Amino acid sequence: LFASTRNQETGREEMTTTVSKPNIIPSRRNFLKGAAALGGSAAMLAAVNDGARADGDPIPVGQASPLTDFAAADGVEFKNGLTLACEEINALGGILGRPLEPYFEDTKQMGDATNVQAVQRLIDRHAVHAVINGYNIGSGAAIQDVIADSGIIYVHYDTTIGHNNLVKSDTARYFGSFQGDPAEYWYGPGFLKFVQQLEQAGSYKRANNKMAVILSAGVYAANIANAVKERAADFGWEISLFETVNVPISEWGPTLAKIRQDPPAVICITHFLPADLAQFMVQFAPNPTNSLVYMQYGPSIPAFREIAKDASKGVVYATVVGALQDEIGTAFEQRYKAKFGENAGHNSGAQPYDGCYVWATAAALAGGTGEPGNDAQNRKVADRMRAMIWRGVAGTTRFIPGEQAAYTYPTQTNDPSLGMPHQFLQIQDPAKSGLLIAPAPYDTAKFMLPPWMKA
């Protein structure tokens, strides 16, 4: 139950959350049966709770997300994902009988200063024991200092190598900061390897050796684009266009003119906002080049297909973190859409959902959570998180020692049980979500030659 309250000092509306207590679970057997229905490793948390009812003192958990402004389509789903996780965990007994109580702060247009202020408010106003975020645009290495100063746990999905480097620089200080997915760097070599596999399977034949790379200003898109650029020659590619565009962008004419003047075999776009990418396809479709079009993350958001419509058919996109189209992922999608609506973006919601389960299970195994300032208890929680191999909605979460970011499969580890799958999907029906075409063993469909391409 969400209620709006007015802060007496600032006069602004704030969202607070009240969690209703779940029913007592009648027996340990039924309790574990209920946990198994959730899939993943939820039964582990259920077993540790040992049939407890979540009627103890609530544990405040926070999230700082872009609930308004240009990334709100994702921010709302991040909120939904944490909300659903808290409700399910509470139905399993919370954390050793204490229910989770989520609080949310808006990061709006994001950026380091805004992101840090939002997290600081969660700590100062609500004394949260953990912050479980989706992504926030920024350096990816600023919130960690607020977390370190407060001694709590932080799980985020900023997908940035900046996190890995920061934690590596001082593992003792940043003990509580975890990136729940792999760094963005892996999008680069992972994409090149994916195209190579399409060629080896005979599913795609390059028209030439040219690849156009289009990026937006910002560390995230630049890191991916540079990773592609650095490794392209290893896979026989020549970067024929490497162009940075200012975003948000709705007019792609100048960029498309360059592409049409010197048509590449592959168009690789490392920008990720769905509305911008949809406009690219709308403007590309009337006069397409014989190019495989790859986009980064954005097409996984329903808004992309809603805007691009038929022009979206054939687009290939990827995410290093998203709900798998398997038994666990499909069951999550059904629960998620039953609660938040058929058009809800469960792939975004899956991020803090998994992150919350990882933290909550580790906390239960460690004997409970720690409030701000209780570094000693939260170090025990962090130790448990580092030691876990968690099978969740997005696949396997296993943290790299000394970096505390998730391993990626198959580029970083060739064992799907030890790394989070770098998923490649393709929109084959604009009325439906993309189909998972790689990697094995998670793929559910075959690559389809886009309708604008020549066989």
Please report, for each region that a protein language model flagged, where it lies by residue.
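Sec-dependent signal peptide hydrophobic core
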Residues: A35-A43
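Extracytosolic ligand-binding ectodomains
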Residues: N7, G11, T16-K21, S27-G34, ...
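Intrinsic disorder/low-complexity segments in short proteins, especially the signal peptide
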Residues: R6-N7, A43
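N-terminal signal peptide c-region/cleavage motif recognized by signal peptidases
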Residues: A47-N49
